[in-house]
Each structure stands twice: as C-alpha cells, then as structure tokens.
Amino acid sequence: MRKFKPGKAMTVFVVFFFPVLLVLGAWQVNRGIEKQEIWEVHNFQKSQSVIDELEILGMNNSEAIYRSVFLEGRFGEETYLLDNRTYRQEAGYEVFTIFRTAEKNSYLVNRGWVSKNKIDIKNETKESKSTSIEGIYSPFRRFGLDLSEAVVSSSWPKVVQELDFDIASFDLGLDLKRVVIQLSAASEHAYEPIWQPAEFNPSRHFGYAVQWFGLALV
C-alpha cells in the first residue's frame, strides 16, 4: 500500500489557511456572544418602568443605558437627515433632531426612518412647541457610512452620510449628552422606528462562524 503524501497545495492550505479559517470562525462566535449580551441587556432594561430625566441623570451609565425615559422640552430646528437608509426596499432618511429639555440639557433624538418621497423638508426647520416624549436611552455610536471626512452643509436640515458624537457635538457647538434617545413610535414627531441595539442579530454571526469552520473542514 502506498503511503499517503499530501501535495504542496494541501500543505500550503493546512499551514496557512486552516488556522486563518479557525480564527475567523472564532471571531464570529465572539461577535455573536457580544451581540447576544447587548440584546439581553436591552430587553431587560426595556422591561423596567419608564423613568424621567432627573432619575436618569442620577444613575451611572450601566444602570441608565437602554432604559425607557420620559423627557419634557422642545425639538430645535437642528435636524440631521442621515442618507442612504433603505427600509423595505425604499430609499429614505433616518432623522435626528436636537431636543432641549426643561432641565436645560440637549439630547440628539433619533426620530426614525422616513421615505424621501414623504418628508417635508421645510417643516423640519421649525422649532416645536413644548412637548413630552418617550424613548430608549441608547449609546451614541456611529450611524451611517464610515467616512474619513463628514461633509456637512451650512443650513438646516443637513443631509449627512455619517453621524457620530464628535461630528454632532462640534457642528452643534452644544454640551451634548453622549447618548441618543430612540424615539418611541407613539411620541409626537416620530417617524418609523428602525433602530436596533446591535446592527446584526447574534444568529447572523453564529451562521458566519459555521461557514468559516465548515470551510476549514472541507
């Protein structure tokens, strides 16, 4: 019986690609676990009672994040229209507007998604009357495309391709809270809520992990 001798191609694969595929699979598993933990915290916090601004300000960040919060104040004219947001196969914007509270704090509020065919641009430049809103107190992560430079126009509303804390706080010149209020669908001035606490579900990462591990075993 001839002794099996792997060819050069198989040797190269085993030495170089097999470990890489295992690392990629393990990375996706870790990402899935991270996303699962985020969803679990979000679901638990969301199940708690709604709290007001004074209560939220008295908490540390881990206690406050993802809690439902009730705020009183008014929307300003400062609105960002985050471009390239497709929902149900339709192009639109995700709308972010400054909300100034009765406690003299400024928050950026994600009012949800709206079709480009349905948004009234002129109406977005008006400051609202005093109102109360409810939403999820969420981390201020980057929204949109990851660009090296953010091009921001000089008039409101501003159409942007990306939005993060540094861009918004510099552009607004405000002592902005490092959170975004994810406006509830029942609140005044809300559009279609599409926000999720994590961009992908854990199952998606676990699915990718299975694919990488499968390739390693082929």
Regions found by a protein language model. Name each.
Residues 1-57, 64-218:
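Surface-exposed, charge/polar-rich loops and edge strands
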